[in-house]
Curated annotation (Swiss-Prot):
Catalytic activity field: UDP-N-acetyl-alpha-D-muramoyl-L-alanine + D-glutamate + ATP = UDP-N-acetyl-alpha-D-muramoyl-L-alanyl-D-glutamate + ADP + phosphate + H(+)
UniProt xrefs under InterPro entries: Folylpolyglutamate_synth_CS (IPR018109), Mur-like_cat_sf (IPR036565), Mur_ligase_C (IPR004101), Mur_ligase_C_dom_sf (IPR036615), Mur_ligase_cen (IPR013221), MurD (IPR005762)
Enzyme type, top EC level: ligase
Upper taxonomic lineage: Bacteria, Bacillati, Actinomycetota, Actinomycetes, Kitasatosporales
EC numbers, comma separated: 6.3.2.9
Stated name of the protein: UDP-N-acetylmuramoylalanine--D-glutamate ligase
UniProt family annotation: Belongs to the MurCDEF family.
UniProt binding sites for ATP: G122, T123, N124, G125, K126, T127, T128
CDD domains (UniProt xref): SIMIBI
Compartments in which it is found: Cytoplasm
An annotated GO BP: regulation of cell shape
Length: 471
């Protein structure tokens, strides 16, 4: 049992996905654990009832007051740094960790050899890239898992019985903010666009938290050649001596880059004499789906895998074996020569821009909660691809106004309803606008909570409506 936790008074901030496991792990390590939580609803009381028999103290309805005697706070990643709890902790000299920081510090628990982390962040594409990376690592015969915001929890991965050779780790800006000691084997920032600014306070603070993923990297910092902000983060990072900057691009790669040449994914980074040579990794058609932004995800995953010494054949086999999650550019059906594609996961303009760029002639279903987003740049860039648009949700007027300014010739159907049944009508209206060869694309550019529980339910409603068309 690590002596640093035995008898220590630790406050866990927030019940839920990360709080309950953190409380259990810390209690098991001998800490005196108090959990504080803002809410006092039925779910919170159920979780409290799970912890209290272990000897964990749970305080519901007050997440702002620092418990007396606290020596360490372990926080859920979504808790804002400006909360009074953290202000009080700062004044008292109490350190604050996130669940990722805790997992990082527990990697060598019980004398086990710590598994290296290959870490991924970015505004969009994190989950897909980490899943691709895990598929490639498995194809190489390595014991691995996709962890972090997906799959196995990080705490379970580092404290459970299963041992790993390497972990593919998805990290959000929230998690990185609270993980000062993280030092990955290699890491990638896929892209940067304004997101979660209400939490971070500014784009500069958001980018700085994303950039923490590069700090102390050992082998490679993988960046997006098309997104200079990601390269700037590499330049600003304090890395281990010998760590390399590795770019990925949808164009022809230069030395120390991965890219695309004549329908092939190629590596000019992890080869001998990279000034002259390149290694074929896979065909573009091996990427599912082969949309431009997904090819970029595949190149980033390949870069991290190659940094870990994985063969070109394993990259190819892993990409071929990969199947994307539901609601991420998922082809639902073809009806009367029209393709219906579900990208409900496109909850912001950056993700939607990538989705719209994947198709030539689109009937676009969009709308929901805008979260302060503006749509002029998105619409202006996609205008020539739009056959029509069907708008749903609370903030649809913002998209309608952008369409009027930048694509006035595009027919728009504005559905003045926010009930879940609106999706069926939206799909029916999209069918009316579409022509054979078109794609009806659900890429909302907005959050879903005005009409649905989450983006999964929204995507399910779309898929069900499409199935009814073909019935």
């Amino acid at each position: 049992m690590p002596s640093e936790f035995s008898g220590k008074h630790v406050t866990v901030a927030g019940l839920g996905v990360s709080g309950v496991p953190a409380a259990k792990v810390l209690h098991g390590l001998g800490a005196q654990v108090t959990v504080v939580n803002d809410g006092d609803d039925e779910r919170a009381r159920t979780q409290a009832a799970e912890l209290e028999p272990l000897g964990v103290t749970v305080r519901l309805g007050d997440g702002d007051t620092l418990p007396e005697g606290t020596e360490l706070i372990v926080t859920a990643p979504g808790w804002k740094p400006t909360k009074p709890l953290f202000t009080a902790a700062g004044q008292a000299g109490v350190p604050v960790w996130g669940d990722v920081e805790l997992a990082w510090r527990l990697r060598g628990l019980n004398g086990r050899k710590p598994a290296p982390w290959l870490a991924v962040t970015g505004t969009n594409g994190k989950t897909t890239t980490v899943q691709m990376l895990a598929s490639i690592l498995k194809a190489a015969g390595l014991r691995t898992a996709a962890v972090g915001n997906i799959g196995v929890s990080l705490l379970d991965a580092v404290t459970g019985e299963q041992e790993y050779d390497v972990l593919a780790v998805e990290l959000s800006s929230y998690q990185l903010h609270w993980a000062p000691s993280l030092r990955a084997h290699s890491a990638a920032v896929l892209n940067l666009a304004p997101d979660h600014l209400d939490w971070h306070g500014s784009m500069e603070a958001y980018a700085a938290d994303k950039g923490r993923i590069y700090e102390g990297n050992h082998v490679a910092c993988v960046y997006n050649v098309a997104d200079k902000a990601t390269e700037d983060l590499v330049r600003a990072a304090d890395v281990e001596e010998g760590c390399r900057a590795i770019g990925f691009t949808l164009g022809t790669p230069g030395p120390s880059q991965l890219g695309v040449v004549e329908g092939l994914l190629v590596d000019r980074a992890f080869v001998e004499d990279r000034q002259k040579n390149a290694q074929e990794l896979a065909e573009v058609s091996d990427v599912n789906p082969p949309a431009p932004h997904n090819i970029a995800n595949a190149l980033a995953a390949a870069g991290l895998a190659r940094a870990f010494g994985v063969s070109a054949a394993a990259v190819r086999d892993g990409l071929r074996a990969f199947t994307p999650d539901a609601h991420r550019i998922a082809h639902v059906a073809d009806v009367d020569g029209v393709a219906y594609v579900d990208d409900s996961k496109a909850t912001n303009t950056h993700a939607t821009e990538a989705s719209l760029a994947a198709y030539e002639s689109i009937v676009w279903i969009a709308g929901g909660l805008a979260k302060g987003a503006t749509f002029d740049e998105l619409v202006a860039g996609a205008a020539k691809r739009l056959r029509g648009a069907v708008l749903i949700g609370a903030d649809r007027a913002l998209i309608r106004e952008a369409l009027a300014r930048h694509a006035p010739e595009v027919p728009v159907v504005d559905l003045d309803r926010t009930d879940t049944g609106a999706m069926l009508q939206a799909v029916q209206e999209a069918r009316r606008l579409a022509r054979p060869g078109d794609t009806v694309l659900l890429a909302p550019a907005c959050a879903s909570m005005d009409m649905f529980t989450n983006y999964n339910q929204r995507g399910d409603a779309f898929a069900q409506a499409v199935r009814e068309l073909g019935a």
